[in-house]
Amino acid sequence: MNDETSQPFLAAVWMLGAIASFTLMAVAGRSIQAELNSFELMFWRSLVGLGVMTAVLVILRRSARAILTEIRPTRPALHLTRNLFHFAGQNLWFYGIMIIPLAQLVALEFTMPIWVALLAPLIVGERLTWVRLSVAALGFAGILIVAQPGVQVLTSGHLAGILCAIGFAMNILLTKRIMRHDSVLCVLFWMTVLQTIFALALAQWGGFTWPSPAIWPWLLVVGLTGLSAHFALSSALTCAPASTVAPMEFLRLPVIALVGVWLYSEDLEIAVFLGAGLILLANWINLNTTRYRRHKV
């Protein structure tokens, strides 16, 4: 993607769709977890996604042979590992939205690119530079401001927010390796299949709860937004470079904060925005440093 082919307005439209999807997913997740635990939620979310992906494959590939060719994974173990991390991260995210204010969770989730920078040397063989270490230190300072240890009680929700960011970072890095060999449709298909199995197995602990009709619409919402959010984000990245798209995603924080105030009477804390500002600055430095290196090469 270069400046001549970049379409920033279209990228912004796609990012608005992604932000709306992530926000709806959070609201639906809170509504569902009034009845179901996070494993049960993930089962229905993945099952809806599997239905959608199957329909897409049938429409696009038509023949059974073409579908089987499309979804045949080159490295099954890598798909399994990737989905274990993504499943853990997504469960922690849904758990976190029940424990801490939405704005705090999203601010902690924004540390994901920092974890990508730190873990990339281990997963994809990239160099760990002083710039990346400095960016990580700045990001962790932002985490401390958001969580405010010593000022407020640290909860399992704060830990869930940090760990979900690590899970999502591992997902990004492993997806990067998988995409060298397999298609997007293959990745999404196995994501929905494997995570349906994971969730169903774990949901049996303590007994599986069947959802009441009152939350069926929310289950549909969380299943559809799980796919639409990532599709919109991927589409935005095809319209403009990451350096243009990434700042747009950070609009999710004020949006989710206002939703928290409006629907759940959560407080708008200055510390959350100050800490998020440091995290976003760290991400911006990391993004532009990476972009500079690529242009230099």
Predicted regions and their residues:
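Juxtamembrane helix-loop boundary signature in multi-pass membrane transporters
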Residues: 1-14, 114-166, 177-180, 280-297
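Transmembrane alpha-helices of multi-pass small-molecule transport proteins
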Residues: 10-11, 36-88, 167-171, 190-206
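Loop-to-transmembrane-helix transition segments
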Residues: 10-18, 65-92, 156-164, 203, ...
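Hydrophobic/small/kink-forming positions within alpha-helical transmembrane segments
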Residues: 19-27, 54, 83-91, 113-118, ...
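Transmembrane alpha-helical segments that form core, pore/gating elements
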Residues: 27-30, 38-39, 53, 151-211, ...
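Specific alpha-helical transmembrane segments that line the substrate/conduction pathway
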Residues: 40-43, 47-48, 95-125, 242-259
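Helix-helix packing/entry segments at the starts of transmembrane helices
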Residues: 105-111, 178-194, 230-261
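C-terminal-most transmembrane helix of multi-pass membrane proteins
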Residues: 254-297
